[in-house]
Amino acid sequence: MYDYIKGKLSKITAKFIVVETAGLGYVIYVANPYSFSGYVNQEVTIYLHQVIRDDAHLLFGFHTENEKEIFLNLISVSGIGPTTALAIIAVDDNEGLVSAIDNSDIKYLTKFPKIGKKTAQQMILDLSGKFVEASGESATSRKVSSEQNSNLEEAMEALLALGYKATELKKVKAFFEGTNETVEQYIKSSLKMLMK
């Protein structure tokens, strides 16, 4: 079982990235491959979950341990496999997902790929309260997280005003989720990624 991999990001495709370490290239399936586009040929650390099947050993990768924890919680629900869990992470900001589960918002959950009403109900039943328990978040840490997200949102709005497309910024935003930077730092780092 692998916890993480550290190596050079050598390739990006629509479904996976390749990280090279010790002369081997590892295919790693991630939610938003192009969110790594600013790090091609640079060293990266990717958190991992391995799925062993009869016909393949698959690696699923994540920007942060929190994103990995959300993935593990999702695949614990009957009817949600690794591919569906990645698709959910790819189209959501994670906060919306957690809020929908804790508030029993079936309508919100059924917007995700391959999630019908029955699976949404199962998600609520199995996962309500789990994300806070898993991360050990207190009211204070949630407040800090909210402030960090506010800085990121403000930076994304500034980049929109500069003429960048929402589709471009979604990939950039996904990369910076869970980080703690000032608005100016987010803008500077985002521009560096967007201009490559």
From Swiss-Prot:
SMART domains from the UniProt entry: HhH1
One Pfam family per UniProt: HHH_5
Region (Flexible linker): 143-148
Region (Domain III): 148-196
Record's keyword terms, sorted: Cytoplasm, DNA damage, DNA recombination, DNA repair, DNA-binding
One annotated Gene Ontology cellular component of this protein: cytoplasm
Residue ranges, annotated region (Domain II): 64-142
Region (Domain I): 1-63
Subcellular location: Cytoplasm
Domain of life: Bacteria
A single GO molecular function term of this UniProt record: ATP binding
UniProt KW Cytoplasm keyword: yes
DNA damage listed as a keyword: yes
GO annotation, biological process: DNA recombination; DNA repair
Family stated for the protein in its record: Belongs to the RuvA family.
Notes on the domains: Has three domains with a flexible linker between the domains II and III and assumes an 'L' shape. Domain III is highly mobile and contacts RuvB.
NCBIfam families (UniProt xref): ruvA (TIGR00084)
Free-text function comment from the UniProt entry: The RuvA-RuvB-RuvC complex processes Holliday junction (HJ) DNA during genetic recombination and DNA repair, while the RuvA-RuvB complex plays an important role in the rescue of blocked DNA replication forks via replication fork reversal (RFR). RuvA specifically binds to HJ cruciform DNA, conferring on it an open structure. The RuvB hexamer acts as an ATP-dependent pump, pulling dsDNA into and through the RuvAB complex. HJ branch migration allows RuvC to scan DNA until it finds its consensus sequence, where it cleaves and resolves the cruciform DNA.
Name under which the protein is recorded: Holliday junction branch migration complex subunit RuvA
Organism name: Streptococcus agalactiae serotype Ia (strain ATCC 27591 / A909 / CDC SS700)
